[in-house]
């Protein structure tokens, strides 16, 4: 379900005068309501974790990378949500004059929007994968849209996990959250090894082609939101939906106060992490992870990951490319950032179960990433105009108090 919440100052003023004329009280929060925000609900997809598929996938991708000479064009998110590793967070958008529906992963770790063409070839990457796996969440047929514009430019993106997509650059009308943006540039992908389309909402400097206005920038430029900023609420691990609010923040969804941390990269949504407390141990983790909604697990360098795993008695399994662990991890893992910001996550969030075996939700990678198992316990406000990410401990509630950024 998607919704747009749009209140203008003129409407609020008119309503206030109307209430006064009738001798009625003006609600205290009338001037605090969101003026221009787009609220887009996530659909949470749960797929059973499969350690064998994880291991086969990563071995296959490592072989592909050794064979390919072309460097990855982007920061590598090991897109674990794309290989059956638990909940993934996607939203429904429409493309074209005839509103062709797509369900796309909402990804703060990349910047391009791409959708799957109706005639696309899905590249199978592990045994048992359906040959039509990439088309199951909607496709796009440019010729059926009267507003479609083929820009005649090739699109190619390869992630550092080896997954890739190729196609052609288009412009068309995009609908999301009840809002509509025109002449939006995106890619129509005709070959892909990724499960479904991706709505990348990071910095334009992280785009795979020469810089262009991606979706958040266009929302601002076309006057739908005031600022290139959005807030992220993934909700609990058992919830069926979460929400991203473009141009706004839901003040009911966190405890304490939001603290703004400087973004440390010009292209990626990174902040400074200091230490991690786990099982009575303090692990030095002076690094700058990407806060990435498009990645299910959390990734650190081998040095840091090994220390975290050792603290909970987890052992590295080279075949599965994961740490085997107890199925009953207790206590919390606490992430300590700059400015005294702390986010506490139950260790149960970091348990992946495959049958009778369990695995630790932290793994090794050259790219440092705090994925969904972290973000579910944080309320995050990404301000790309102000170059900050504000964090607070999440509060799970159906209440809402939205204000404009």
UniProtKB/Swiss-Prot annotation:
<keyword id="KW-0732">Signal</keyword>
<dbReference type="GO" id="GO:0005576">
    <property type="term" value="C:extracellular region"/>
</dbReference>
<dbReference type="InterPro" id="IPR021109">
    <property type="entry name" value="Peptidase_aspartic_dom_sf"/>
</dbReference>
<feature type="binding site">
    <location>
        <begin position="107"/>
        <end position="109"/>
    </location>
    <ligand>
        <name>pepstatin A</name>
    </ligand>
</feature>
<comment type="function">
    <text>Secreted aspartic peptidases (SAPs) are a group of ten acidic hydrolases considered as key virulence factors. These enzymes supply the fungus with nutrient amino acids as well as are able to degrade the selected host's proteins involved in the immune defense. Moreover, acts toward human hemoglobin though limited proteolysis to generate a variety of antimicrobial hemocidins, enabling to compete with the other microorganisms of the same physiological niche using the microbicidal peptides generated from the host protein.</text>
</comment>
<feature type="signal peptide">
    <location>
        <begin position="1"/>
        <end position="25"/>
    </location>
</feature>
<feature type="glycosylation site" description="N-linked (GlcNAc...) asparagine">
    <location>
        <position position="50"/>
    </location>
</feature>
<feature type="active site">
    <location>
        <position position="107"/>
    </location>
</feature>
<comment type="subunit">
    <text>Monomer.</text>
</comment>
<feature type="region of interest" description="Disordered">
    <location>
        <begin position="52"/>
        <end position="78"/>
    </location>
</feature>
<protein>
    <recommendedName>
        <fullName>Secreted aspartic protease 8</fullName>
        <ecNumber>3.4.23.24</ecNumber>
    </recommendedName>
</protein>
<keyword id="KW-0325">Glycoprotein</keyword>
<keyword id="KW-0865">Zymogen</keyword>
<keyword id="KW-0964">Secreted</keyword>
<comment type="function">
    <text>Plays a key role in defense against host by cleaving histatin-5 (Hst 5), a peptide from human saliva that carries out fungicidal activity. The cleavage rate decreases in an order of SAP2 &gt; SAP9 &gt; SAP3 &gt; SAP7 &gt; SAP4 &gt; SAP1 &gt; SAP8. The hydrolysis of Hst 5 by SAP8 causes production of the DSHAKRHHGY, HHSHRGY and FHEKHHSHRGY peptides.</text>
</comment>
<dbReference type="Pfam" id="PF00026">
    <property type="entry name" value="Asp"/>
</dbReference>
<feature type="compositionally biased region" description="Low complexity">
    <location>
        <begin position="58"/>
        <end position="70"/>
    </location>
</feature>
<feature type="disulfide bond">
    <location>
        <begin position="122"/>
        <end position="134"/>
    </location>
</feature>
<keyword id="KW-0378">Hydrolase</keyword>
<feature type="binding site">
    <location>
        <begin position="292"/>
        <end position="296"/>
    </location>
    <ligand>
        <name>pepstatin A</name>
    </ligand>
</feature>
<feature type="active site">
    <location>
        <position position="292"/>
    </location>
</feature>
<dbReference type="GO" id="GO:0004190">
    <property type="term" value="F:aspartic-type endopeptidase activity"/>
</dbReference>
<dbReference type="InterPro" id="IPR033876">
    <property type="entry name" value="SAP-like"/>
</dbReference>
<keyword id="KW-0843">Virulence</keyword>
<feature type="domain" description="Peptidase A1">
    <location>
        <begin position="89"/>
        <end position="392"/>
    </location>
</feature>
<comment type="similarity">
    <text>Belongs to the peptidase A1 family.</text>
</comment>
<dbReference type="InterPro" id="IPR001969">
    <property type="entry name" value="Aspartic_peptidase_AS"/>
</dbReference>
<keyword id="KW-0064">Aspartyl protease</keyword>
<keyword id="KW-1015">Disulfide bond</keyword>
<dbReference type="GO" id="GO:0006508">
    <property type="term" value="P:proteolysis"/>
</dbReference>
<keyword id="KW-0645">Protease</keyword>
<feature type="disulfide bond">
    <location>
        <begin position="327"/>
        <end position="358"/>
    </location>
</feature>
<dbReference type="InterPro" id="IPR001461">
    <property type="entry name" value="Aspartic_peptidase_A1"/>
</dbReference>
<dbReference type="InterPro" id="IPR033121">
    <property type="entry name" value="PEPTIDASE_A1"/>
</dbReference>
């Amino acid at each position: 379900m998607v919704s747009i919440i749009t209140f203008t100052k003129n409407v609020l003023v008119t309503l206030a005068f109307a209430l006064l004329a009738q001798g009625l009280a003006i609600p205290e929060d009338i001037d605090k309501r969101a003026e221009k925000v787009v609220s887009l609900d996530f659909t949470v997809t749960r797929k059973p974790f499969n350690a064998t598929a994880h291991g086969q996938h990563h071995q296959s991708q490592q072989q592909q990378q050794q064979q390919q000479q072309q460097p990855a064009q982007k920061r590598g998110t090991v897109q674990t949500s794309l290989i059956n590793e638990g909940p993934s967070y996607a939203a429904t958008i429409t493309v074209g004059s005839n509103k062709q529906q797509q369900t796309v992963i909402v990804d703060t770790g990349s910047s391009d929007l791409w959708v799957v063409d109706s005639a696309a070839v899905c590249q199978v990457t592990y045994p048992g994968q359906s040959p039509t796996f990439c088309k199951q969440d909607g496709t796009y047929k440019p010729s059926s849209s009267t507003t479609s514009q083929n820009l005649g430019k090739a699109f190619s993106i390869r992630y550092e996990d080896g997954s890739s997509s190729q196609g052609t650059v288009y412009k068309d009308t995009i609908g999301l959250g009840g809002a509509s943006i025109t002449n939006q540039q995106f890619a129509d992908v005709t070959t892909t090894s990724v499960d479904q389309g991706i709505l990348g909402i990071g910095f334009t400097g992280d785009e795979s082609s020469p810089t262009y206005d991606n979706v958040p920038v266009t929302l601002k430029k076309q006057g739908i939101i005031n600022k290139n900023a959005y807030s992220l609420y993934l909700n609990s691990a058992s919830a069926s939906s979460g929400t991203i609010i473009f141009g706004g923040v839901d003040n009911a969804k966190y405890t304490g106060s939001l603290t703004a941390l400087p973004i440390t990269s010009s292209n990626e949504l990174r902040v400074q992490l200091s230490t991690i407390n786990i099982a009575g141990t303090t692990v030095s983790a002076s690094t700058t992870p990407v806060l990435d909604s498009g990645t299910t697990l959390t990734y650190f360098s081998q040095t840091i990951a090994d220390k975290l795993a050792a603290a909970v008695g987890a052992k590295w399994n080279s075949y599965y490319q994961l740490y085997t662990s107890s199925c009953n991890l207790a206590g919390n893992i606490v992430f300590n950032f700059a400015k005294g910001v702390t986010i506490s996550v139950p260790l149960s969030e970091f348990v992946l179960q495959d049958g009778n075996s369990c695995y630790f939700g932290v793994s090794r990678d050259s790219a440092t990433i705090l994925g969904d198992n972290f973000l579910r316990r944080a309320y995050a406000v990404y301000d790309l105009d102000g170059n900050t990410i504000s964090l607070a401990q999440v509060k799970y509630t159906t209440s809402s108090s939205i204000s404009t950024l």
